[in-house]
Amino acid sequence: MNYSEIMIRYGELSTKGKNKMRFVNKLRNNIKHVLSVYPEVTVYFDRDRGHVYLNGADYQEVSASLKKIFGIQNFAPSYKIEKSVPALKEAVVEIMQTIYKEGMTFKIAARRSDHSFELDSRDLNQVLGDAVFTAIPNVQVQMKSPDITLRVEIRPDAAYISHEEIKGAGGLPVGTSGKGTLMLSGGIDSPVAGYLALKRGVEIEALHFASPPYTSPGALKKAHDLTRKLTAFGGNITFIEVPFTEIQEEIKEKAPEAYLMTLTRRFMMRITDRVREERGAMVIINGESLGQVASQTLESMQAINAVTNTPVIRPVVTMDKLEIIDIAQEIDTFDISIQPFEDCCTIFAPDRPKTNPKIKNVEQYEARMDVEGLVERAVAGIIVTEITPKEEVKDEVDSLIEDLL
C-alpha cells in the first residue's frame, strides 16, 4: 500500500483562542507555497487539522518539506481505505504484518466523523483488534504507550489508517507575528538570523547590498540562493537588491580608513530603515553577534544604531560562531555562505577598524558627504524580486555569470 495523504497537527496554534483560525489560515497558505514544487499535491484544512493529499507525489520528498515548515507540531502519513469492515480488517492486518516485530505491543485507536458507519469507535477497536490477534497470535495489546498505535478514522468520503507520527518544526506560522526586514549579507550569520525570526512567525523580506563592479554577479546569486533556502520554512520571500557602489566609493574617499566599517554600517542601517518603512515592515533583523568582528562591539552597535529609532532584532547576538555554524549546517545554508564571493562588508574592510567609534567623530566625517542624497538615490534604485521554493531553470544572475565566463 502507498500513502495517500499526510495529516497535519498544529503546534502552538492550539493556544491562540479566538485568533486560531487566522494562524491556521496562514499555516495553510505557507504549506501551499512550500509544496507548490509538487503540482499534483493538494492541501485542505479543517478546524482541527490539515490534510495534504499526495495524489501520487513522492511521500518521502513531501515529508522532508513538511518537516521544515514552522507551525506544524507533528504529522502522520495515512492510507486511504474503502469504508467497509472487511477492507479495514484486511488493511490493518497487512500494515501490522509489515511493521510488527517479535515482542512489540499495539493498540487500535478508532474515531469516526461519519456517524452513519455501521460500527461505533469502541466496536471498531474490538473488531480490528480481533483481526490482528487472528493474524499474529502472540501479539500483545497495551493501551498506554504501546510500540504501535494504529489510528483509524472513519470520514464521510473513506476510511484512513496511520501508524507513524513525525515531529514537525514547531514554532509559529511565518507571517503571524508581523513583518521584518532582514539585512542579508551573504555570510553565515544573517541567514541563521532570518531562520530564527521565521521560527517565531516573522515574515521576512531579505535586503541585500550590492556594489558592482566590486561585488560580482556570483555574490548576488549567492544571496538569492540563501534566500531560497529560507523559503523552505514558510514560503515565498521578497528579495530587495540595493545599489551601494556610490556610497562605498564616497565613504572610502572622504573618511579615515579606521571608520570605514562604522560609516558603511550606518548607511546600511539608514537605507534598510527607509525601505522597511516604505514596505510596511515593523523591525530590522540582522546577524550581528556580539564581539565577533570589529563592527559588532557594543560601542560599534551603539554608534550604528544611533541612525534609527526602529527596533533592531539580533537573533544570534549571544551565540558564538560554532553555535551559529551548527544551525547554518542544519538549515543547509552553510555551504552556500562559505562560497568565496566578496560582499559589501568585505571589499573595503580596513586592516585596523575602529572598535570604539565616537559618534561625534562619525558625524563629523558624515558631514563631508551628502548623506540624504546618497540614501535617496540608493532607495530609488532598489530592485525587488520574489524568491520561491522552486528554483528557476536560469535567472538573470546565472546569465550574467555565464557571460563573464
Swiss-Prot record:
Q: Which SMART domains match?
A: THUMP
Sorted alphabetically, the keyword list is: ATP-binding, Cytoplasm, Nucleotide-binding, RNA-binding, Thiamine biosynthesis, Transferase, tRNA-binding
Chief subcellular location equals cytoplasm
Which pathway is this protein engaged in? Cofactor biosynthesis; thiamine diphosphate biosynthesis
PROSITE patterns, per the entry: THUMP
Residue ranges constituting the THUMP domain according to the UniProt record: 60-165
**Functional note:** Catalyzes the ATP-dependent transfer of a sulfur to tRNA to produce 4-thiouridine in position 8 of tRNAs, which functions as a near-UV photosensor. Also catalyzes the transfer of sulfur to the sulfur carrier protein ThiS, forming ThiS-thiocarboxylate. This is a step in the synthesis of thiazole, in the thiamine biosynthesis pathway. The sulfur is donated as persulfide by IscS.
Biological-process GO terms, alphabetical: thiamine biosynthetic process; thiamine diphosphate biosynthetic process; thiazole biosynthetic process; tRNA 4-thiouridine biosynthesis
Which amino acid positions bind ATP, per UniProt? 183-184, 208-209, 265, 287, 296
Q: Kindly provide the name given to this protein in its UniProt entry.
A: Probable tRNA sulfurtransferase
PANTHER family this protein is in?
TRNA SULFURTRANSFERASE
Organism domain of life: Bacteria
Identify the GO cellular component terms for this protein.
Answer: cytosol
Q: Which reaction does it catalyse?
A: [ThiI sulfur-carrier protein]-S-sulfanyl-L-cysteine + a uridine in tRNA + 2 reduced [2Fe-2S]-[ferredoxin] + ATP + H(+) = [ThiI sulfur-carrier protein]-L-cysteine + a 4-thiouridine in tRNA + 2 oxidized [2Fe-2S]-[ferredoxin] + AMP + diphosphate; [ThiS sulfur-carrier protein]-C-terminal Gly-Gly-AMP + S-sulfanyl-L-cysteinyl-[cysteine desulfurase] + AH2 = [ThiS sulfur-carrier protein]-C-terminal-Gly-aminoethanethioate + L-cysteinyl-[cysteine desulfurase] + A + AMP + 2 H(+)
Question: What EC designation does it have?
Answer: 2.8.1.4
Query: Which HAMAP family would you find in this protein's record?
Result: ThiI (MF_00021)
Gene Ontology MF term list: ATP binding; CCA tRNA nucleotidyltransferase activity; tRNA binding; tRNA-uracil-4 sulfurtransferase activity
Q: Which organism is it from?
A: Streptococcus suis (strain 05ZYH33)
Tagged with keyword Nucleotide-binding: yes
> Which NCBIfam families did the record assign?
tRNA uracil 4-sulfurtransferase ThiI
What are the subcellular locations of this protein?
Cytoplasm
Pfam families in the record: ThiI (PF02568), ThiI_fer (PF22025), THUMP (PF02926)
- Please give the family membership noted in the entry: Belongs to the ThiI family.
